[in-house]
Amino acid sequence: MLIVCLSVLPERMQQRGGEQGREAALALEQEAQPQREAASGRGKQRDSGDESSPASDGSLSAFARGLQIGVKLNNDNKVETVPLEWYVRGVVAGEMPADFEMEALKAQAIAARTYVVRKLLRSGLSDEPLVSDTTDDQVYIPLERLDELWGDGKAKEKLARIGQAVEQTANLIITYKGEPIQAAFFSTSNGYTENSEDYWDLALPYLRSVASPWDKQLSPRYKETVELSHTEARRKLGLDRDAGLAMRVTSRTEGNRIKEVQIGGRNFSGREVREKLGLKSSSFTWTVSRDYIRITTYGYGHGVGMSQWGANALAKEGKKAADIIAYYYTDVRVEQASKLPRSS
């Protein structure tokens, strides 16, 4: 049995929509230096001539039909092996609410499949099933657990909708200049998406900032306020216990998130503050009172790529999955994986 090793990328916090692959940071940061040296054509699996090679016949489709993907179920400490398209179903179930519009579900399915195909071509085959079911990769929910997860007696209906989205997009992936993209996605924007280099220090031409105004009105995750004691904030930020806590924003990203900020005499990136304090977004305001700090965040997730709530809004407006993808990913194409060029 062939098992794909996909220990990689694109964030999700929990079942109802979020981010991928530790926000895709691991994969993107690991690839940053090589991609600076060579713009494309990296990491393809060699053509061994074996029929188990996805490129041995110049096509991925025949291989993919029999492909089994090993998924590490962290809570159970075991591996589940499932066909590729069933894996995509489990990811869509884990990454997007099943009651979202059909075209949004289709866009999510295409993004999830693109993730797998990209990693397959870059990582090749392995006996080690290292795809996690968590945000270290893509959130994956075993299909037999969906009834328990959803808990509303509608698992059959919801799974049918997800199955429809996956089946109607079968073999479709997102490409840029003929190669699968890093199909980053997240839950909710602050009104704009981010340029990839403003979060991961790696500029990808298809991950550009665009307006996403729908999130504010539609997403329940758009705004959140948390309070931290002065002691807790200093501890998490690594500041001296007598350091001041006034915040001064020194620069912002094109997506209007905090790029650089000064707190307690130290410089931080917006991402650093987000991760150290466990914030939902790097778009935030900060108010210091006598006893605590009140932080209000706008949006949920890293902000790079497709906003899921924005995608749902576009679908409600009548946009198709291809339109949604074209809006959030710049200058890309949606095409059959079987049309990928033969590996060299």
Residue ranges and their predicted role:
Residues M1-S344:
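Conserved, single-site charged/polar hotspot
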